[in-house]
Swiss-Prot record:
The keyword 4Fe-4S is assigned to this record: no
Phenotype for residue 195 to P: In strain: cv. Cardinal; clones 386 and 910
Main location: other
GO cellular component: peribacteroid fluid
Subcellular location, record wording: Symbiosome, Peribacteroid space
Coiled-coil segments on the chain, per record: none
Name assigned to this protein: Nodulin-25
Miscellaneous information on this protein: The sequence shown is that of cv. Nagyszenasi.
Keyword line: Nitrogen fixation, Nodulation, Signal
A GO BP annotation: nodulation
Organism listed in the record: Medicago sativa (Alfalfa)
Length: 246
């Protein structure tokens, strides 16, 4: 009986050990996942280690890199510090005076330039008026009008003409004629006898007679009116006389 109980306990212990091993084996995770992860990690570590081992830095590499980096960094820091100081720090006691003097000089230069531009670039209309006034102030100017040239009456005597246009339109006549103003030339009617006209009032009141009509002059003024001829309308001479009297 005693031996039987001992065998039973021994068999139970063996069973428990086998069961624990089976359970542990079945509950363990898939080994392929762990293996792949470990392999990737090992590959990365190997690459990094190989690159470091193949290209070791020289003895002066760190010094050169440090010097260039420090120079660039110092330059950037200096620029930043200068701009920061100029922007944030208040100006010194003498800065206000120097700045004020500089601004005053710039303003004076701008005002001087504006004054010169205003003086040199006067309006064209003002220049034209000044030129016109200067010409009028020089003295009287004799101007030959178009009415005088159009109504010029030729004569046989010499006539004094002051302008080039009058010389071009001059037609000699038989007797001398005195011409003083444009009004006299417009109202002047030549005749066989010389006549003198002194003033505008006398010219306005002057009425020529039929015998004093100069047919050449009237034909020049009124080319559509002709003397009585074989092919003209009766009464045109009377109409011409009436116009002369008017």
């Amino acid at each position: 009986m005693v031996y039987s109980n001992t065998y039973m306990l021994l068999g139970l212990g063996v069973f428990v050990l086998l069961s624990s091993h089976v359970l542990a084996y079945n509950m363990r995770a898939d080994p392929s996942i762990h293996d792949s992860t470990l392999d990737d990690q090992k590959s990365n570590d190997f690459v990094k280690t190989a690159s470091i081992a193949e290209c070791p830095p020289g003895p002066d590499t760190y010094l050169e890199l440090s010097d260039s980096t420090l120079d660039d960094q110092k330059s950037m820091d200096y620029v930043k510090d200068a701009s920061t100081v100029d922007h944030n720090c208040p100006p010194g006691p003498h800065t206000y005076l120097e700045l004020s003097a500089w601004l005053q000089e710039e303003q004076n230069s701008i005002d001087k330039v504006k004054k010169v531009l205003r003086t040199d670039e006067a309006p064209d209309n003002q220049k034209g008026l000044e030129y016109k006034d200067a010409r009028h102030n020089d003295g009287p100017i004799e101007i030959s009008t178009r009415t005088e040239k159009d109504n010029f009456i030729p004569s046989d005597g010499p006539i004094e003409i002051s302008t080039r246009t009058e010389n071009e339109n001059f037609i000699p006549s038989d007797e001398p004629i005195e011409i003083s103003t444009g009004t006299e030339k417009e109202n002047f009617i030549s005749s066989d006898e010389p006549s003198e006209i002194s003033s505008g009032a006398e010219k306005e009141n002057f009425i020529p007679s039929v015998s004093q009509v100069d047919w050449r002059t009237f034909h020049a003024k009124y080319p559509w009116i002709k003397k009585d001829g074989p092919n003209t309308v009766t009464g045109s001479r009377k109409l011409l006389n009436d116009i002369a009297i008017k």
